[in-house]
Swiss-Prot record:
Similarity annotation: Belongs to the class-III pyridoxal-phosphate-dependent aminotransferase family. HemL subfamily.
Pfam entry (one): Aminotran_3
Cofactor names: pyridoxal 5'-phosphate
Organism of this sequence: Picrophilus torridus (strain ATCC 700027 / DSM 9790 / JCM 10055 / NBRC 100828 / KAW 2/3)
GO CC, alphabetical: cytoplasm
Lineage: Archaea, Methanobacteriati, Thermoplasmatota, Thermoplasmata, Thermoplasmatales
Metabolic or biological pathway, per its Swiss-Prot or TrEMBL entry: Porphyrin-containing compound metabolism; protoporphyrin-IX biosynthesis; 5-aminolevulinate from L-glutamyl-tRNA(Glu): step 2/2
Name recorded for this polypeptide: Glutamate-1-semialdehyde 2,1-aminomutase
Domain of life: Archaea
Length: 420
């Protein structure tokens, strides 16, 4: 098989044969070469319905013609100039006009960069030491984020990462998502030196875990009380459920917002944004340093504008309803076979936890049956449905998914469940 041979070559070039850990699974990861709409195709020509969507960015589906044309036009006009461009202004205005908490922003090349700079900015603004993150919350692969993190660090049983200095871990406090007492106790002890709380408003790298009623409001209240900043990491949730941030849906205004994924139309991108007062601390107007050769690069800006202009006219209820219908059908299938699952979802995000109990916290999530999940993943793969290959990632639905995809996914799930 061509894919097996290529992966053998990849193993000689890249650690575990991949360039990001969660892409690896045994015996051999599928090697893809193209996509169109809701479908992706491997190097052997096999077609799959895709619910990974590049881990979230491809909300319009693969090879969207408007996004592809925008990238091609920009490539013909130049790939990198090392200076400000009109398209940076255009994309920045789209985001500013639809995310109320953002007055100014900086584009970066990834969500990792965005959260890294947001944390530095919060410390620079408050002149405080500690960052408080949530257990299982994932904010990228920089040192300050890799402490009791989610995503691949959970998939492979690594609590954080070797190579992160103890001096850094001592500046990061870890609270429990959906546990107000946990957060309050940390503020009682360290509150006057907590620069910021950073959280995904919906945890999306530990599967999907929704906030309990009042929890995010509590975070806003306690950070205000202690003059700490609240950072919402909306790299996943930004423009996923509506043409806005999730913060605008729930009407909670963070002090700093990070975004990525969808706003780049599938091209590499991230951003962090805040009030003018806070953002003006960024160099060269202030003394909090941030830079990047490829930040705001023309290809990503062109892709982002095309994607966002198209998204602005889309009816989000379509993908939200598709997801709700799929989740209901999956519950029926699992219940019919007396298999205990909890399927957490919001909007067009969902994840299946092989767990008889509700999953509301990190502790709940890690009790899920990872082996059974992987068996289900493999059987779905055998039936031409590609899910993210980890119990602790998230499935996504795109505007390219339609009734035929839904029906085929349900039939595949019926076959898969009978084998696990």
């Amino acid at each position: 098989m061509k894919g097996d041979d290529l992966f053998s070559e990849a193993l000689k070039l890249f650690p575990s044969g991949v360039n990001s850990p969660v892409r690896f699974y045994r015996p051999v990861p599928v090697m893809f070469e193209r996509g169109r709409g809701s479908r992706i195709y491997d190097v052997n020509g096999k077609e799959y319905i895709d619910y990974s969507l590049g881990f979230g960015p491809m909300i319009l589906g693969h090879a969207d013609p408007d996004v592809a044309s925008a990238i091609k036009r920009q490539a013909d006009n130049g790939i990198l100039f090392g200076s400000i461009t009109e398209n940076e202004v255009r994309l920045g205005n789209i985001i500013k006009n639809h995310v109320k908490s953002i007055e100014k922003m900086r584009f970066t090349n990834s969500g990792t960069e965005a959260t890294m700079h947001a944390i530095r900015l919060a410390r620079g603004y408050t002149k405080r030491k500690y960052i408080l993150k949530m257990e299982g919350g994932f904010h990228g692969a920089h040192d300050y984020a890799l402490i009791k993190s989610g995503s691949g660090t959970m998939t492979f049983g690594v609590p954080s990462s070797n190579g992160v200095p103890e001096e850094i871990t001592k500046t990061v406090l870890v609270g429990k998502y959906n546990d107000e007492n946990s957060i309050e106790s940390l503020f009682n002890e360290y509150g006057n030196d907590i620069a910021a709380v950073i959280t995904e408003p919906i945890l999306g790298n530990i599967g999907v875990i929704n906030p309990e009623p009042g929890f995010l409001e509590f975070l806003r209240e306690i950070t205000n009380k202690y003059n700490s900043l609240l950072i919402f990491d909306e790299v996943i949730t930004g423009f996923r459920f509506a043409f806005s941030g999730y913060q605008d849906i729930i009407n909670i205004k963070p002090d700093i917002t990070t975004m990525g994924k969808i706003i780049g139309g599938g091209a590499p991108i991230g951003l962090f944004g805040s009030s003018s007062e806070i953002m003006d601390l960024i160099s060269p107007s202030g003394n909090v340093y941030e830079s990047g050769t490829f930040s705001g690069n023309p290809l990503s800006m062109a892709a982002g504008i095309a994607a966002m202009e198209k998204l602005q006219g889309m009816d989000y209820s379509r993908i939200n309803n598709y997801t709700a219908d799929l989740v209901k059908s999956l519950y029926d299938i699992f219940n019919d076979k007396n298999i205990d699952v909890n399927i957490n979802h919001y909007g067009s995000m969902f994840q299946i936890f092989f767990n008889k109990n509700e999953v509301k916290t990190y502790d709940d999530a890690i009790k899920s049956d990872k082996d059974r999940f992987f068996k289900f993943f493999k059987k779905m793969l055998d039936h031409n449905v590609y899910l993210p290959p980890s119990q602790f990632e998230t499935n996504f639905v795109s505007f390219a998914h339609g009734r035929d995809d839904l029906n085929k996914t349900i039939e595949a799930a019926k076959e898969a469940v009978s084998c696990i």
